[in-house]
A protein has these predicted regions:
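Short solvent-exposed beta->alpha transition segments
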Residues: 57-91
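Surface-exposed, charged secondary-structure patches
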Residues: 81-119
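Sec/Tat-exported extracytoplasmic proteins
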Residues: 41, 48, 52, 60-64, ...
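Hydrophobic pocket/interface hotspot
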Residues: 44, 56-57, 64, 109, ...
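Short beta-strand edge/turn micro-motifs at domain boundaries
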Residues: 125-147
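Bacterial Sec-dependent N-terminal signal peptides
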Residues: 1-28
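Short, low-complexity N-terminal intrinsically disordered segments enriched in polar/charged residues
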Residues: 19-54, 58
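A mature extracytoplasmic/lumenal domain signature
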Residues: 60, 70, 101, 111-113, ...
């Protein structure tokens, strides 16, 4: 009787593990995600060019970080960077996604950026890593750091 009960429980457990997982809801189409992220990168660059630190800040998720900054420090940091870009004539940013991956909850973007002056000359280049998180159905910056 005990063997029969244990065997039945193990079969139910095995069946529920094998067939009870819903993998379709956890998948993210990386091709579609890449289009969305590249669009968000362009939007981010446009906000920077326009000097709109509030719109930049609003692209971040709750609990997000920019390097080691959080909350209002992110807003202050972008405000300072915008002022510097106006003084240095480096308001144009070009983002290029080089890699995009997912764990089904987050998108991890690796890329390069280039600051250009008003004549289109390259002034500064670098690399970045961004972790995107969905919040209220929209992808938001969750971790943002230069490499």
């Amino acid at each position: 009787m005990l063997k029969s009960t244990l065997l039945s429980l193990s079969l139910v457990f095995t069946f529920s593990i094998t067939y009870g997982q819903n993998t379709e809801s956890a998948t993210i189409d990386l091709q579609k995600a890449r289009i969305i992220i590249e669009s968000l990168d362009r939007q981010f660059a446009q906000h920077f060019y326009n000097g709109d630190s509030i719109s930049l800040y609003n692209m971040y998720a709750k609990g997000a970080s920019l390097e080691n900054k959080r909350g209002n420090e992110i807003l202050l940091s972008w405000g300072q960077q915008i002022r510097n870009s106006i003084r240095n004539d480096t308001r144009t940013i070009i983002y290029t996604t080089t890699s995009l991956s997912t764990d089904s909850e987050f998108l991890v973007e690796l890329g390069t950026y280039e600051f250009r002056d008003s004549k289109g000359n390259s002034k500064y280049k670098g690399k970045y890593l961004v972790v995107w998180k969905q919040e209220d159905g929209n992808w938001k910056l969750y971790r943002d750091m230069g490499l």
